[in-house]
Curated annotation (Swiss-Prot):
This is Dihydroorotate dehydrogenase B (NAD(+)), catalytic subunit. Catalyzes the conversion of dihydroorotate to orotate with NAD(+) as electron acceptor. It comes from the Archaea. Keywords: Cytoplasm, Flavoprotein, FMN, NAD, Oxidoreductase, Pyrimidine biosynthesis. Its main location: cytoplasm. FMN binds at S17, K42, T43, N117, K152, I177, G203, G229, G230, G251, T252. The lineage of its organism: Archaea, Thermoproteota, Thermoprotei, Sulfolobales, Sulfolobaceae. The keyword Cytoplasm applies. The active site is at S120.
Length: 290
């Protein structure tokens, strides 16, 4: 069992944002059939947002993708149509502080945790563009909700500084990390393959970067962290817990292997804990304490 902000979950395995479309029946089916400890929704904005034109996703190598969907979503009200069969972490976004606050007001009745996305690299005016306003965003959101508020940050050089600003203004935790902005050129046309141009690189290559940032931030602040980035098997989960994460988001691995991999990873974790005589709580942050 894992407790995060008075929410008790069976284990640390959650589904990361961007994997499951905000289609109520689909979310409910995944909850019921595969039993993740929680699902993070795709980032929702106040009003529907059209995705970028295709191509929006390309596979670079096994376990490595690049996407520029551009936060396309059906709007915040769609969240309220989801029948909650497992805890929802609702990812919220917007092009202004006020929009983000309004989204939180709309979705909070369905959420266990609010995750503010200020790190998407794939839409001008959204996500990463607002990271410099993180303190003001947190203050605004905390004025309208009593739910735990986490902030999703990117793999930036100033991530520790931004994490500190978010926590200083009342953030309850952090989600680390979002994708890394990348570019692939078509050698026939000499143009970017993705319609948007750049895209967020995700998958296995992200894991050591995510692990380093999680450890650095946990060492600095000792805060609750949802670790995301390149997790592919149970050993990766243990690594993230050891670095300081309390929950671990599965993303690209679900695209590559399907949702049944959740149970495969879960069994690996259970066998490891049994063999070592440990609980999840014993492992969280252990690499920082050594």
């Amino acid at each position: 069992m894992i407790t995060i902000k008075n929410i008790t979950l069976n284990d640390p395995l959650i589904i990361a944002s961007g994997i499951i479309p905000d289609v109520p029946n689909y979310v409910e089916t995944i909850c019921e059939k595969y039993k993740p400890s929680a699902i993070t929704t795709k980032t929702v904005t106040l009003n529907p947002l059209e995705p970028h034109k295709p191509p929006t996703v390309i596979k670079l190598h096994d376990g490595i993708y690049m996407n520029a969907i551009g936060l396309g979503n059906p709007g915040a009200k769609a969240i309220n149509e989801i029948g909650v069969l497992c805890p929802l972490i609702v990812s919220v976004g917007g092009s202004s502080i006020n929009e983000i606050k309004e989204v939180v007001e709309v979705v909070q009745s369905k959420a266990k945790i609010i995750e503010i996305n200020v790190s998407s690299p794939n839409r001008k005016g959204y996500g990463e563009s607002l990271s410099k306003l993180i303190g003001d965003i947190i203050e605004s959101v905390k004025s309208v909700t009593k739910l735990p508020v986490f902030v999703k940050l990117g793999p930036w050089d100033n991530v520790i500084e931004l994490a500190g600003k978010a926590l200083e203004k009342g953030a309850d935790g952090l989600t680390l990390i979002n994708t890394i902005k990348g570019l692939i050129i078509d050698v026939e046309t000499f143009k970017p393959i993705l319609y948007y141009g750049t895209g967020g690189v995700s998958g296995r290559c992200l894991y050591p970067i995510a692990l380093r940032i999680i450890k650095d931030v946990y060492e600095e602040y000792g805060v609750d962290i949802i670790g995301v980035g390149g997790v592919y098997d149970w050993t990766d989960v243990i690594g993230m817990l050891a670095a300081g994460a309390k929950l671990v988001g599965l993303g690209t691995v679900l695209i590559e292997k399907g949702f049944s991999v959740i149970e495969e990873i879960r069994k690996g974790l259970q066998s490891y804990l049994l063999e070592k005589g440990l609980k999840f709580e014993d492992i969280i942050g252990i690499s920082v304490r050594k």
